[in-house]
Amino acid sequence: MQLTPLHIQGGRNLSGEIAIQPSKNAALPIIVASLLSSEPVTLHGVPRLSDVYTILELAHHIGTRHVWTGPNSLTLHTPEILNTDAPYALVSKMRASFIMMGALLARAGEATVSMPGGCAFGYRPVDQHVKAFRALGVHIVEEGGNFEARREGSLNGAFVFELLTVGGTQNAILASVLGDGVVTLENASIDTDVVDLINFLNSLGAQIQGGGTNTLTIRGVRALRGGEYRIIPDRIEAGTFMIAAAATRSRLTLTNVRPDHLRAVSSKLMEMGVDILETEGRLIVDARDRELKPVNVTTQSFPGFPTDVQPQMSALLATVPGTSVVQDPVYPDRLTHVAELHRMGANITVSGYTQVIQGGTLHAAPVKAADLRAGAALFIAALTTEGETVIEGVQYLNRGYERLAERLRSIGANAWQPQPVLASAMD
C-alpha cells in the first residue's frame, strides 16, 4: 500500500499542549542492548515508529521474542541467539542497526553485519566502530559489503576515538559489557542517547562508569539480569516543535521534555527573540507578536546545537528577515531540504556545509522529503505559508514523528493525510 502525501493548509497559529514522544534514537540501541540478557526486559516509552519496527524485525531474526504490553510498553526476551548475522535487507534501512554487531559480539562471540543504511545524505563511515573493535581484541574483516567479526575472549584494553561518535561509542560499550575484561574508552560521546544506554545497562547489572563524561570504564560481568526501564523523551522531536512554534509566531507548551537536553536549541531561539519558560518536564515557547532576528548557527555534538535540528532551523530562518548563516560540519551533506525550500520561495545559497539564508516570506508548493529531518523542515515551512502544501516522502517522516498529522491538528494546524484508495478487483 503506497503512502499518501501529507497536506498542510498553512497560515494558522499553533496553541495548546503537545506531549513529546519517547526518544527513537535512545530506544533503538536499548532494544538492541536488551538481547545481552537472557531474561525478559520490559521497556516503557517506546515510540511506535517504522525504525522501531525495523529493529524489532532484526532482533526477531537474531532470536528475540517481543510483545507490546501497552501503547508504548514493550517486553523483549532473548533466551538464546539463533542467528549471528544482520541481513542487508534490514540493515540497509537504518544506520542504527549496525550496533547489532557489538551486541552479537558480546552475547555470541561473532557477528556478520552488512554496511548500514538510513537517510541518504552523504557518506557516514563506520571506521571508528571498526578501529575500536580491533583495538579491543576483535578480529574484523570487510568482505562483499559485510563486516565479519569474532572475538576469542573478553574485550580488553583502551581506545581513544578520533572524533566524537554516538554509534561508535554505543557499539564499543555493547561489545564490552559481558565477560571478565576491562575496557576504557576515551573521547567517548556524552550524547543523551549514549547516557540513556549506559543507565539502562547498569540497571540490568552492567558495570559502566563515567556516563556523561568523555572517559568510560567498562568492567565486564558474567551476565545481565532482566528488568524494567523508561526511555528518555525525544529531544529532536521537542526541538522540532519548539521551532514550529517560533516559525508560526505561536505560543506552545511542550510536555514530557527534558529542558536540560534542549539548552542549545532554547538558547538560539531566545537569541532570536523567542520567550522560553522552563518548568519541571515542560517548556513553554512563546513567539507571539515577536519580530524575530536572524542568527548564525553551527552544529556540534551534544551539548551543542544538534545536526538533527539543522534543517528545521534553516526552515525557520528562511522566514526571518535578514541574513542568517547555518553551518553543519557534523553532517556536511545534510542539505536535501534546501532545493525543496527553494520551491517554496526560500532564498538560500549553499557553499560546502554552509547555508547563507536571506529570510522572507514562503509560499505553498508541492515538495518531496528525501530524508527524515528534511521532511520536518518542509512541514515547518508549510505551517508558515498561505495556501496548501503537499509533502511527498511521508515514509521518511514516519521514521521519526508518530501520528504527525493527528498531532499537528491537536495544536491547531490544518494538516491531513488522505487514506489510500485501494483499487477494486477487476473481473
Swiss-Prot record:
Domain of life, per lineage: Bacteria
Its biological purpose: Cell wall formation. Adds enolpyruvyl to UDP-N-acetylglucosamine.
A GO MF label: UDP-N-acetylglucosamine 1-carboxyvinyltransferase activity
The enzyme's E.C. designation: 2.5.1.7
Alphabetized CDD domains for the sequence: UdpNAET
Active-site residues annotated for this sequence: C119
Pathway where it operates: Cell wall biogenesis; peptidoglycan biosynthesis
Record keywords: Cell cycle, Cell division, Cell shape, Cell wall biogenesis/degradation, Cytoplasm, Peptidoglycan synthesis, Pyruvate, Transferase
UniProt keyword Chaperone present: no
Catalytically driven reaction(s): phosphoenolpyruvate + UDP-N-acetyl-alpha-D-glucosamine = UDP-N-acetyl-3-O-(1-carboxyvinyl)-alpha-D-glucosamine + phosphate
An individual GO BP term: UDP-N-acetylgalactosamine biosynthetic process
InterPro entries referenced in this protein's UniProt entry, alphabetically: Enolpyruvate_Tfrase_dom, Enolpyruvate_Tfrase_sf, MurA_subfamily, RNA3'P_cycl/enolpyr_Trfase_a/b, UDP_GlcNAc_COvinyl_MurA
Annotated organism of origin: Deinococcus geothermalis (strain DSM 11300 / CIP 105573 / AG-3a)
Stated family: Belongs to the EPSP synthase family. MurA subfamily.
The protein's name: UDP-N-acetylglucosamine 1-carboxyvinyltransferase
Bridged cysteine pairs (disulfide): none
Gene3D superfamilies (UniProt xref): Enolpyruvate transferase domain
Amino-acid positions noted as binding UDP-N-acetyl-alpha-D-glucosamine in the UniProt annotation, renumbered to this chain: R95, R124, P125, V126, D127, Q128, D308, V330
PANTHER family reported for this sequence: UDP-N-ACETYLGLUCOSAMINE 1-CARBOXYVINYLTRANSFERASE (PTHR43783:SF1)
Localization in the cell: Cytoplasm
Modified residues (2-(S-cysteinyl)pyruvic acid O-phosphothioketal): C119
Entry's Gene Ontology cellular component terms: cytoplasm
Sequence positions that bind phosphoenolpyruvate: K24, N25
